[in-house]
Amino acid sequence: MDSRDWTQLGCVAYPSPIHPDYHAGPASTIAFDNQDELLWIGTQKGFAGSFIGRELKRFTAFRIHPETDGPLRQFLFVDKGVIFLGSRSVYMAARSGVPIWSIRHESMQDLRAMSFTSKGTSEILVAGWQNKMLVIDVNKGEVVKELPTQDQYSFLKMSRYICAATNKGTVNILDPITFTIKKQWQAHGAFINDLDTSNDFIVTCGGSHRQTHNTPAILDPYVKVFDLKNMSAMNPVPFAPLAAHVRMHPRMLTTAIVVNQAGQIHVTDLLNPSNSQVCYTQPQGVVLHFDVSRTGEGKALADNKHNTYVWGSPNKIQFTEIGIPPRLPDPPQPSLLPPDPDMLEELPLSRIGLPYYREQLFSALPPDIISDVGAPPQQIDPNILSTLTKTDWGYIGPNKTGLQRNQYMDTRSTMKTSNTIRAPKFLSEKARESQTGSEDNTLATNETAMMTPNNDHWSLRPEAPPEYRICEIKYSKFGVDDFDFGFFNNTPYPGLENNITNSYANSLLQVMHYTPLLRNMALQHAATACLADPCLLCELGYVFDMLQKGEGPSCHATNMLRALNHTSNASVSGVLEDIAKDKNPSTLVKNLTMFLFDKISQDYKGTPPISTELERTLFKLNQPPNPLDLVKRLLETDARYQIKCMHCQHVSPRTATTFVNKLCYPAAKPNIRGMKAQRITFSQVLKAGLENEAVNKGYCTKCQRYQNLDQRKIIFNIPAVLALCTEITTAEHRKLWSTPGWLPEEIGIIVDQGHVYCYEGDDLKLHLNRGIHNITVYSLVGTVVNVETKSPQKSHLVATVNVGRAEPESKDQDRWHLFNDFSVRGISKVEALTFNAAWKMPVVVMFQVKAANHRFNMDWKTRLDTSVLFRDNNPHALKTYELLDRETEIPGPDTVIAIDTEFIRLKEREIHIDEDGKSKTIRPISHAIARASVVRGQGSREGVAFIDDYIHIKETIVDYLTEWSGITPTDLDPINSQRNLVSPKTAYKKLWVLVNLGCKFLGHGLSQDFRVINIQVPRNQVIDTSIIFMKPPSQRKISLAFLAWYLLKEDIQQNTHDSIEDAQTALKLYRKYEEFMANGSFHDVLEALYKKGKTLNFKPPRISTGAAKDAGFGAVHRVGTPPVPAPGTTEGSFEISNSSTATTGGSALSATGGMGSASASSSMPSTPVRKPIGLGGPFTVAGVVKPSPATSLDNFGAGAVGTGITTAAATMGGGYGGYGTDGAYWGGPNDMAPTSMIGGSAFIPAKFPPGPPETRGFIPYRPQVLLAEREAAAAAAAAAAAAAANNDVGGRGGVACGNGGAGGEQGKQE
């Protein structure tokens, strides 16, 4: 970070001299926006203003609160807007100034600071110089909690904890969940003037009294530093000019920026304070406020003279990562009428009279008159442009349009009529009609015609037929899943959906997929341990694997196309349709072909493939080849340019390795009367393109001047995959391609002494029969075709592919298909190879060596690299999972795993509104996976998660969907997240490996999960509980929450969704299903389930509702996934035994102590799950417990099973060690813990330990017990208390309870 080139880039006076707050004082606070290129400034009387970019151009200004409330204190930024803090109110508004909510509360007396909490941007904590703190729900705009406090706070900043600066110079560390003080430091003697935090550090500036408290405090000549990780103070950083303000650099984690009141800026490394840089600013007054932008490139200072300055490097500065300025309002349109002095602004329009009239007004147009004002101008046909001659004033040429001079065309008539295939009915509509028997067969004829082979050559028609035109996806209220893709494809070859950005690549992906060498290359690489992100070769392998496994009519390449956005040089290569200068589909796909072949060759060289058996056999190699040599043989045209000066005959060589070759057409020769025009063949054009001989102007090093240079390419090797760009630019080129049979199915190439010879047709057969030369035969795999349509319809790309090349050897090798995105149908060879100069021209042609047809190497499936499943990508993250054991837990075809995912929203849906006001969805809402959890489905650790990945999203996130996903911005922040944050590639690779190992995926509503993950799982590997518990005639799928409530008596998804919990619940439902099938009661249970669901509208009643109480249900729920215990410890493990023990042989529950998690011997997960409580049955009394006199509270709860007693009134188990839930218990000999049991499944304590359970470092349970049960248990406890009075009952180890439980029996014996 170099501060030497910093300079003042902008300055603004706010409040300005004309502002009503000018005389009240200078700015009260400043802050950089974290999303838009804005700097916000607050005033002393409650105004806020925002300014754009380095020039500080005025954007918005509006009042936040009345001037009697005093100055504006602080800004906080969220996706939807800005939160403003005043002394007596909290206000939220959009960045444009539109208010969202405002809160005034009786407890708001003198607020000074606010901060986000553990729930991310959905909740804030506000505090000040008052005795109460308040928690505010940002989404609802209401106070949800009031917290008393003994300290008065001036600053709040969120990092690992909430760091709070008091008005007495101390720094308090607050728990972000309970808001209790965990640590306190005395930072400065009198006051703290500024505070900031990073992930691990706190830095403060402040002042102290130099002699006595009666003397005024002055600023300290140092910056105090505290280590949050180790909870310790570090050596202060000296700052002789007296530190007034400090900020941590947002990108350089150990760098702080310190400013004094005169504007002197020091950039200091906290770990090496002697290494610092200094920058001198020239403020007009004393610096009152300072802030640094999110990128660290912009610095803002505000002085007491109403000026705010922006400093930074003039060559590189932007406030946010993206750097997009906010959208400005449209400027007002000037009035077309001259100003009228009589038209006063206060004059109502009703005072202006209208003349009397008897004839019809001119504005009353009859309905048959059409006004086409504003219609878009007609696009000029490219075919016409190619025939025009350029002049000094424009272009001139023959009029072939059939229209007269200056005659225009009704451009809207073509918009109203669409020559496309009529869209089918939605699947939901068909289902309703089939149930009612009113199915409409009007589309049956269309569908039959669509799928019945037609011998008519569509390519000979003057315009593109419907089969070649753009196919649009229609959306119902059920989204894209309701669209009938099967209507457009009844072949076994999946299409690709086109509702994704950059989906123009679909046609090229289909051609590459059916090129066996490219498919094998991608899959062999994807099966390696490659975790590079992005890696386009891996992404191609995943797409090809989806298309191979595809059992439906369509797939989508979302992940591949997203990875394209993040690949280096993609934006400058013209392959991203949103930002490409030339958006013509043919140009885009040509650029993409060259870009992809270059990138996948680099990726292939980086990691050796799993197997090279196919390549060794094909190229007759003895040893495993080097990846560099393989790339040359597979993709590279090995050549060298020979550049010869036409003047001095000097020859200079230059390497000319290419992956994609361009065809070169001979110059048109004038027709000579009486001579037959020479026929130009494809082989001649190919030879000219490979050798690329041309004469160009260039610099000759020998002549030392520009001369005509003869450039010729000497070829040494032609690759096995020959990708060609057609480079069709003139009408002559179109005429060539329109010649029937001009593109051959096979070509032969001979490379001899740097020369290339190409043959086709009879010439090829002749050379093959003679067998003199070493000729390589190439087969045509497919073409990418540009379908040109007249304006306003858009041109687009389709693919014609011979899928027979990529299938096992068969008699019928010519199996041509037309891939029009998700519309796929078989076509004849003649149709595939016929082109039309008017609308059908090829852009990319793909050949492959004939010897590689029908050849596959499936070794990658048996040699799949599985190391990603056993690698911990983030050892320091919060552990909510346990990795698989390499020795005992090897996934395979018999492995059942339960999966659930959580999503975030990347883009809102795009809507197109027609001129008649009708709207339709162009692109649906775009989601991305943010969390993926996979739990074991069998074995001794059934229900224990072994994958719990949070995904680092690189795109801009529109909505975290926290209410439904449980995902907060902090979870996905690579700097502040404590989660197991991984790249999208790593998370996807784990699931892809499990699919290809044959594991069975169990979950609820998996189709949506798989769609967002963008993975194809074969049907025989999917177990979907939403389908298992679906009554076929109803076609209604029941929610996971309702199934859990009804079948498992558990109330899940109380506060948010937790993917581990949902996966565990789906697993338990499947076990229930197996149980019902075993005893033959499944159909009866299903009937009762739907009957109960209809009465409750298939929504589970929550515990607080009367319906839940009437049903007799109780539940324990949690608010997140607690961490699993460290390996080798027994902390927090629960063991449930179903064997009969002790006197009456009931079920028993024992706890082996600890704090937090549970494991079960009978298929219960070690991650704590909600357990039913209050279901009736016999009552027992848990053992009386007390800690050992030598045991402190901190280490209480880690011993062996304690002692207990039993009486006729109740069974009393051993002591309960620690408190692993907030229902955990410790106490004296006379304390009783009543518990309601059913089958030994749960327990309830009678009292809680002092202090909130969150201070013990775990996520609490919230047990609820019916009042009647508590009273009954208390009565039983009283009877047992007398017998237990003289017994030292309890201990540190655990509790055992149940009818005749083991702990009670042990207590009896002792």
Curated annotation (Swiss-Prot):
Q: Name one GO biological process term.
A: mRNA processing
Reaction(s) catalysed (UniProt annotation)? Exonucleolytic cleavage of poly(A) to 5'-AMP
Per the UniProt record, the source organism is Neurospora crassa (strain ATCC 24698 / 74-OR23-1A / CBS 708.71 / DSM 1257 / FGSC 987)
How might one describe the regulation of this protein's activity? Positively regulated by the regulatory subunit par-2/pan3.
Q: Tell me which EC number(s) this protein carries.
A: 3.1.13.4
Q: Where is this region: Disordered?
A: 1121-1169
Q: What class of enzyme is it?
A: hydrolase
- Exonuclease domain ranges (all copies): 897-1070
Binding of a divalent metal cation occurs at: D900, E902, D1009, D1062
Subunit annotation: Forms a heterotrimer with an asymmetric homodimer of the regulatory subunit par-2/pan3 to form the poly(A)-nuclease (PAN) deadenylation complex.
**Which CDD domains does its entry note?**
PAN2_exo (cd06143), Peptidase_C19P (cd02672)
The UniProt record gives the binding positions of Zn(2+) 1 as: H525, C530, C535, C538
Where can this protein be found?
A: Cytoplasm
Record function comment: Catalytic subunit of the poly(A)-nuclease (PAN) deadenylation complex, one of two cytoplasmic mRNA deadenylases involved in mRNA turnover. PAN specifically shortens poly(A) tails of RNA and the activity is stimulated by poly(A)-binding protein pabp-1. PAN deadenylation is followed by rapid degradation of the shortened mRNA tails by the CCR4-NOT complex. Deadenylated mRNAs are then degraded by two alternative mechanisms, namely exosome-mediated 3'-5' exonucleolytic degradation, or deadenylation-dependent mRNA decaping and subsequent 5'-3' exonucleolytic degradation by rgb-30/xrn1.
What GO terms are given for molecular function? metal ion binding; nucleic acid binding; poly(A)-specific ribonuclease activity
Cofactor, free-text remark: Binds 2 metal cations per subunit in the catalytic exonuclease domain.
**Linker as annotated region, ranges:** 318-463
Q: What is this protein called?
A: PAN2-PAN3 deadenylation complex catalytic subunit pan2
Q: Which UniProt keywords apply?
A: Cytoplasm, Exonuclease, Hydrolase, Metal-binding, mRNA processing, Nuclease, Repeat, WD repeat
Kindly list the GO CC terms recorded for this protein: P-body; PAN complex
Q: Where is the USP domain?
A: 463-850
Pfam families per record: PAN2_N, RNase_T, UCH_1
What is written about domains in the entry's comments?
Answer: Contains a pseudo-UCH domain. This ubiquitin C-terminal hydrolase (UCH)-like or ubiquitin specific protease (USP)-like domain is predicted to be catalytically inactive because it lacks the active site catalytic triad characteristic of thiol proteases, with residues at the equivalent structural positions that are incompatible with catalysis, and it cannot bind ubiquitin. It functions as a structural scaffold for intra- and intermolecular interactions in the complex.
According to the UniProt entry, which residue ranges have a biased composition of type Low complexity?
A: 1139-1168
